[in-house]
Each structure stands twice: as C-alpha cells, then as structure tokens.
C-alpha cells in the first residue's frame, strides 16, 4: 500500500507499508527518456506511433520535469511488476490512536487555527500500551488506580491495557518528546475529529505559538496542504509526507455501514452504539476537571483514545479506506476522492490497450449533470408494499449496455441503432462492437468481489465448525 509519492528531479521517493505494518521506502530513477507527458497532436508527423488517446485521436510526447497523475500510472506499468509489486501488497499499517486535552478558559475552547491555549495532556494508544503525556505529577498509586479504572471501563472489549504516565516540566518539552520519540515513528495516526481539531491544534500550537520546528515528522521534511470541510466550509491543514494522519470521524461518516441508526457523530454516541462503551462522564467543567481532579482528567483522556482503537477493531472502517486506495493503486489519501481512484484505474486499463489520457489544456466551465431518476412516492396506506434491492444494479446496467466514455456516439432519441450499437432509454448510443473500458473494469472488480465473498463465506463456515468441535470437546471433558 502506497502512502506518498514524492517527486524529485529524475527520481521518485515512494513510501509504502511493508509486511510488518511499518513504513518502507523505494526510490525509482526516472530516466530522461521517460520524463514527458502526452498531449493531443494535430500534426500527423509529430504523432507518437502505436498510441492513441482514449477518444481515438493522435497524441505526442512533450518534455516534462515531473510526471503527471496519468504518467505515474503508466510509469509503474513500464517499470514492471518485479520493481513495483511490494508497493501494492495488501499490508495494513500499525494504527496509533491519539487524543489531546486543551486548557479551557472562560472564553471556552480555543480554535485550532489560533491554538492560543496550552495543551494539557496527550493520550497515545496502541494495545497493550496506553500512554498519557501530562504536565502534573501523578503518584504510582494513582497510576495503578487509573489503569484499573481503564480496564474496568473497557471490560466488554475483552482487552486489558497497561497504563504509562509521563510528566514534563513544560508544554514544549512534552510536545517535542511526543512528536519526536513517538508520533514520528508511527505509520498511521488517527483520532476522532482529528483533522478538524487535535492534529491541526498540535501543528499550529507548535509552529505558531511555541516556535517549534516539527519538520522531522516527515522523513524528507516535506509537508503538503490537505483540504477538509467543516460545516460546509473548506479549511486547509498541513500534513507530513510519508505518514498517514487520518481523521477517524471522516472515514466513519464516509464508509461506515455497521452503525445502522446514526443519531449523531459524537464519539460518545458512536462508541455506545458500536461497542456498548461510553466516554467518561464528569459533572463539572473542563477547568475543574484539570484543576481539581487531575487523575480523572487523565483517565478521561486515556479512554477517549482507547475508544478509537476499539472502534477501529469493531467497525474496520479504516480497512475500507486503505483497501480502496490499494486496489486502485493510488496514494492512500487519494482514496477520499472517487474521481482520483477512477482516473488511475482508467489510465492503467487504457494503457494496456495502447490508449492514453493526454494532458488537456482547455479550461471548461463547471457543468451540471442529471442524476439518477427517483420515482416520487405517493403518500397513502397500502395493503401490499414491496422493496427491491438489486445487487450491483448500476455496475450491471453499465456492463449490460456497454456504457463507457470512449465508445459513446451520440444522445438522440430519434437515432436508429444498428446491430453493433446499443441505445438506452435516454437516447444515449454506444458502440457495442468491442468491450469498452468501464465494463471491463467493472467485470474485473465484480469477479474479485464474488471471489472475496466466497472466501468469506468459507471462512465463516470453517469458524462455525471449529466452534462446534470446541463445544463438543468441552462437553466430553465435563
């Protein structure tokens, strides 16, 4: 699984997850003969032999310092499986859950962009270890009590945690130790509303308020902007190259299918619904929690991070996010964009047909497209009601009617289609004389899905049989 592809003149630095769940790196040289992009070509004499654009037009190569998104996919194919296979093995990264607690003043919570209030503690969890980094002292007895409370609280999970507390003289020392000696080595860091608050707060607190250089969070000291949406408004946050920092709330909202009734997206509600375990309740204010009941403050912080890890094991939503990026062979964060995954997949399948997607310099205005038809229900009391749920309905329609981009002919309800053409009810006409790109891709993925379902069913049957054997042996022993 690829984390990031960082381009330097003449080479690629690629980070990926290895078989141990850690980050490894591959450097690939890009010879000058491969440093180009394709463009549409009107002069036959300049056209590249043997290649056409996806829509059947001539193309030419033009020099380029860096490979664009289509050329990257083509370059990996040209490099060969022997050089790139390890990049796309189905390896999952070690996950670390994180949660911060910030000083709350009479003005309330500080905004992450300003990060004007001190970070009081940081929880850091990967079973069996639960670290809390804090600013106040705790006795050995208090730490033992916190560990007991943690394990009592999450007893339903069947897990036990070892609690480790580290105290610091000041916030800067705490943040540096946490980031340099712990977070820097983690392949995947996540938390609840982590982009919108915790991570953005840590970054801005360090760089704007404490004047700390935390470029070391990236092995190459390179960072990039990532755009998030909060309440309909876009905001940019900074993320380090070659490390996955992911908001579990974001992937939960996008991909979770386990929690049926989503009344709200708070950690307390979701953990209760999925695990039957709630956050820690405290009757006072956050100020009182830190000032008067510091041991409960630390307990509260620790449980929040533990709940993230337990949710991931229960929901497995992170696997969906990471798996999508891997099977479509894009950088992990690109899995948030269906368009980027589709473009990468189309590029690979087209390239094997000697078709490419040229760089198009035309700028078009944004267009609106008609969505799927939804029948307007008529409110009433009915004696018979039926609900139909078709397996893979849209992919099946696209495969059946040969719907793709490169074989589209015209949209005209009066058009008379011949034997090698397919006309849909909307009047869209497609060339059916060959298997087009999108139906080929869908058939391939559909076949993989059926195979995966069969393997899953066989595993479930084997598990049930083993449970039965175990029960019979226990009864025999008794």
Descriptions of predicted regions:
Residues 135-262:
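Conserved DEDDh/DEDDy metal-dependent 3′-5′ exonuclease domain
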Residues 41-91:
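Non-catalytic propeptide/linker segments at domain boundaries
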Residues 76, 81, 87-107, 214-232, ...:
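Extended, Lys/Arg-enriched charged tracts that mediate electrostatic binding to polyanionic substrates
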Residues 285-402, 464, 470-478:
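Common nucleic-acid-contacting/processivity interface regions adjacent to the catalytic cores
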Residues 183-207, 245-340:
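Acidic, Mg2+-coordinating catalytic module of metal-dependent nucleases/exonucleases
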Residues 105-108, 133-134, 199-200, 254-256, ...:
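Short helix/loop capping segments that flank catalytic or ligand/cofactor-binding pockets
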Residues 3-40, 78, 82-188:
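Conserved RNase H-like, two-metal-ion catalytic cores of nucleic-acid enzymes
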Residues 384, 390-478:
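Helical catalytic core of nucleic-acid polymerases
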């Amino acid at each position: 699984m690829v984390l990031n592809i960082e381009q330097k003149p003449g080479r690629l630095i690629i980070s990926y997850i290895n078989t141990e769940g850690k980050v490894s790196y591959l450097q690939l040289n890009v010879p000058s003969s491969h440093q180009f992009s394709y463009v549409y070509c009107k002069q036959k004499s300049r056209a590249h032999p043997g290649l056409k654009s996806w829509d059947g037009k001539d193309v030419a190569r033009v020099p380029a310092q860096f490979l664009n998104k289509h050329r990257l996919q083509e370059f990996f194919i040209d490099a060969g499986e022997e050089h790139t296979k390890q990049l796309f093995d189905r390896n999952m990264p070690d996950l670390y859950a994180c949660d911060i607690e910030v000083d709350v003043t009479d003005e309330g919570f500080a905004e992450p962009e300003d990060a004007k209030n001190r970070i009081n503690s940081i929880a850091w969890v990967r079973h069996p270890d639960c670290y809390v980094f804090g600013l106040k002292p705790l006795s050995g007895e208090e730490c033992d009590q916190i560990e007991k409370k943690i394990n009592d609280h999450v007893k339903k999970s069947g897990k036990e945690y070892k609690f480790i507390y580290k105290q610091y003289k000041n916030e800067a020392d705490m943040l540096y130790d946490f980031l340099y000696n712990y977070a820097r080595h983690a392949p995947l860091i996540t938390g609840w509303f982590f982009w919108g608050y915790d991570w953005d707060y840590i970054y801005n607190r360090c760089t704007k308020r404490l004047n700390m250089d935390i470029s070391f969070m990236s092995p190459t000291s390179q960072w990039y902007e990532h755009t998030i949406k909060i309440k309909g408004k876009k905001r940019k946050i900074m993320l380090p190259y070659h490390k996955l920092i992911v908001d579990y709330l974001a992937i939960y909202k996008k991909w979770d299918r386990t929690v049926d009734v989503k009344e709200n997206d708070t950690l307390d509600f979701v953990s209760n619904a999925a695990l039957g375990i709630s956050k820690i309740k405290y009757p006072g204010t956050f100020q009182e929690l830190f000032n008067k009941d510091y041991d409960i403050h630390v307990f509260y912080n620790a449980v929040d991070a533990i709940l993230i890890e337990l949710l991931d094991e229960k929901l497995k939503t992170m696997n969906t996010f990471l798996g999508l990026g891997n099977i479509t062979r894009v950088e992990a964060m690109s899995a948030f964009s269906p368009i980027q995954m589709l473009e990468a997949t189309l590029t690979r399948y087209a390239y094997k047909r000697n078709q490419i997607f040229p760089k198009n310099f035309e700028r078009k205005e944004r267009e609106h497209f008609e969505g799927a038809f939804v029948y307007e229900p008529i409110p009433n009391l009915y004696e018979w009601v039926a609900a139909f749920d078709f397996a893979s309905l849209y992919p099946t329609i696209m495969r059946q009617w040969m719907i793709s981009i490169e074989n589209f002919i015209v949209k005209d309800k009066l058009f008379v289609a011949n034997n090698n053409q397919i006309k849909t009810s909307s009047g869209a006409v497609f060339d059916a004389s060959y298997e087009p790109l999108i139906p080929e891709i869908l058939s391939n993925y559909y076949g993989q899905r059926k195979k995966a379902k069969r393997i899953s069913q066989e595993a479930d049957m084997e598990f049930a049989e083993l449970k039965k054997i175990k029960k019979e042996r226990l009864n025999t022993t008794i």
